[in-house]
Swiss-Prot record:
The gene is PER31. This is Peroxidase 31. PROSITE patterns: PEROXIDASE_1 (PS00435), PEROXIDASE_2 (PS00436), PEROXIDASE_4 (PS50873). The record marks R57 as: Transition state stabilizer. It comes from Arabidopsis thaliana. Ca(2+) 1 binds at D62, G67, D69, S71. It holds the Pfam family peroxidase.
């Protein structure tokens, strides 16, 4: 009964959060808001094609633990270790932070003290997703930025590449997300890359789910990893720069990269949805868009809560 009550309260939160936000929030205060973000992310994506994956990951690491409040952007100080310096966030690509800073700088010149960093992340994520072939979804605007960011508050809140699928399901359910929504959001691994340290320990072990030829290729790709920890492999080796449903097709063939990827196809609670999305890209796009929109509304601050940061990396 308690879990049902919690889910009801989460549903009520999402409904009321959406009702407080609007898609045209900046139409009068910053009419070029969308154009400025689109120009910024397009230029960045052209010069560095990994930007889309970097920002999508940044968005998840900001929103999932405690809500979409741009707390992951805040830099640490001598008195506080911020979220971005927690161990799980140290591998977040710099291009993700850079494009948000560029967008914020341009927006501050056009509309000072008006646009929140959390709104910038949400829109930039959606727009970058589109540049790599992903689906469109409406982004509701009016979020405010958090005044706090503490590494200690992230403990056990974000899934690791090695987290068992049962625990990942629990983590998502505790935030009000269903198993199907979790599987859909995992499709973000359709683009981007992972460092060898996140999976190389499992390669070559028995019963890990790797296609044998794929395991050999991964061993070869990561052979110099001890000397160069920056070596990485694409999450989707078939269409690494295109957002599509190939990720799910790969899982069925033993071509998943991370332990969490393999878990999606080994657990009967999630395998059904993997099969579904592997067969139907339109359905995957529809469900992914809905889940991303829902995630973008999670834990937001509005009204008098939070602030509009002048710089995304520092509290006013």
């Amino acid at each position: 009964m308690a879990s049902l009550k919690s889910l009801f309260l989460l549903f009520l939160f999402f409904f009321t959060a959406q009702s407080r936000l609007t898609t045209n929030f900046y139409s009068k205060t910053c009419p070029r808001f969308l154009d400025i973000i689109r120009d910024t992310i397009t230029n960045k994506q052209i010069t560095n094609p990994t930007t889309a994956a970097a920002v999508i990951r940044l968005f998840f690491h900001d929103c999932f633990p405690n809500g979409c409040d741009a707390s992951v952007l805040i830099s640490s100080t001598a008195f506080n270790t911020a979220e971005r310096d927690s161990s799980i966030n140290l591998s977040l690509p710099g291009d993700g932070f850079d494009v948000i800073v560029r967008a914020k700088t341009a927006l501050e010149l056009a509309c000072p003290n008006t646009v929140s960093c959390s709104d910038i992340i949400s829109v930039a994520t959606r727009d970058l997703l589109i540049t790599v072939g992903g689906p469109y979804y409406d982004v509701f605007l009016g979020r405010r930025d958090s005044r706090t960011s503490k590494s200690s508050l992230l403990t056990d809140l974000l899934p690791l590449p090695s987290t068992p699928i049962s625990k990942i399901i629990q983590q998502f359910e505790s935030k009000g997300f269903t198993v199907q929504e979790m599987v859909a959001l995992s499709g973000a691994h359709s683009i981007g890359f992972s460092h060898c340290k996140e999976f190389v320990g499992r390669v070559g072990r028995n019963n890990t789910g790797y296609n044998p030829r794929f395991a050999v290729a991964l061993k070869k790709a990561c052979a110099n990893y001890p000397k160069d920890p920056t070596i990485s492999v694409f999450n989707d080796i078939m269409t690494p720069n295109k957002f599509d449903n190939m990720y799910y097709q790969n899982l069925k063939k033993g071509l998943g990269l991370l332990e969490s990827d393999h878990g999606l196809y080994s657990d009967p609670r999630t395998r059904y949805f993997v099969d579904l999305y592997a067969k139907n890209q339109d359905l995957f796009f529809k469900d992914f868009a809905k889940a991303m929109q829902k995630l973008s509304l999670f834990g937001i601050q509005t009204g008098r809560r939070g602030e509009i940061r002048r710089r995304c990396d520092a509290i006013n």
